[in-house]
Amino acid sequence: MKITFSPELSIPCEVCKNQSNGYHFEVLSCGACASFFRRSVVSKIKYQCKDGKKRCQIRYLDRHFCRYCRFSKCVKAGMKAEKIQKNRDLDSSPTPTDQNNCIPSDVLHDDGILIKDIRGLFKQFNPHNASEGCSKLEKLTEGLQFIRRNQERECIKIIDEMDSESLKDVQFKVIGSCATWLLFSSFFQKLEENEKVVILERLWHGWTVLEFLSRSLEIFGNKVIDEKIVFISDNTAIRLITAFENSLKTASPKKSESIKKKLELSFSVIFDELALHFINWKPTEIEISYMQWQIVWSVAEQLLSGNSLEKGEHFTEQLSKDLHEYYVRELKLENYAFRIEKMMDIVQIVQNNFY
């Protein structure tokens, strides 16, 4: 008998063994357990074990969980309460810090200023070209194709240095690309402007790593790892480590050493971990879009609440169903657990290092 695995069933929830739909609070889990954990932390609920032994089995097939043991299992699995924004003031939400930026703030321009310049895009851009009748995941993939539509594949300029103004221009363009891609999500389109802005502000660093790296590996292959080359625009790539070493020549020895230490860790993650995962697997555009949304949701679920949070959970669950249909109907795969595991590995590396 032929057996197919949905993306959720191939990797079960670490709490209740139900269908997982991505990482929540750093644990691969289902939406129900993630919501339960969030409610418990925000409401500061103190549970009592149903039978007093504190060893109850947590299985999704059971109608009534022991809430004490379910919460304990969430914590034991690795869910972190500090990942929950208990007072969700979106307008005053802090920007990402050096600890989780792929490039330190010593090097980057103020992304808050750049994002304010992009606010108008949320009002003006409407991805009307998204095909009618296609799935939500296919629409996100159309968005990926849209922001890559002018990608050069032959006449590529490779540079070894970049001045401050050029870096600012790259930042502005990539934040714009991230915002544009997000608008291919029907869920994101309907969010309030302040919700969109704060998600974009928190998101773009890690999103950029995955976008630039996947695009670069598709065209350059192993040269990305060997020469540390990545695209920074449609027709320009940069030898990343060489360029930053050159840019630090005029800095004071103390500042130069400080920035180098911060960059070395990020570059190691990008080239020694993420790039190798891609090279050994070669994901499709559909899979890249799915991974990007998993990263989006890991940020957004910490910031949203109420109706927005609920709709986002439904949208994310639908993407998992769309991915299953893609594997079964398009790729004709009987067992795609390997591909799901690869995607989740990449998503977790980005989450752990850039957020």
From Swiss-Prot:
SMART domains: HOLI, ZnF_C4. The keyword Transcription applies. Residues 126-355 form the NR LBD domain. PROSITE patterns: NR_LBD (PS51843), NUCLEAR_REC_DBD_1 (PS00031), NUCLEAR_REC_DBD_2 (PS51030). It holds the Pfam family Hormone_recep. InterPro entries: C.elegans_Orphan_NR (IPR051152), HNF4-like_DBD (IPR049636), NHR-like_dom_sf (IPR035500), Nucl_hrmn_rcpt_lig-bd (IPR000536), Znf_hrmn_rcpt (IPR001628), Znf_NHR/GATA (IPR013088). Keywords: DNA-binding, Metal-binding, Nucleus, Receptor, Transcription, Transcription regulation, Zinc, Zinc-finger. It comes from the Eukaryota. Residues 10-86 bind DNA. One of its GO terms (molecular function) is zinc ion binding. Its main location: nucleus. Coiled coil: none annotated. A zinc finger (NR C4-type) spans 13-33, 49-69. It is found in: Nucleus. Orphan nuclear receptor. May play a role in modulation of lifespan and immunity. Belongs to the nuclear hormone receptor family. This is Nuclear hormone receptor family member nhr-127. It comes from Caenorhabditis elegans. The gene is nhr-127.
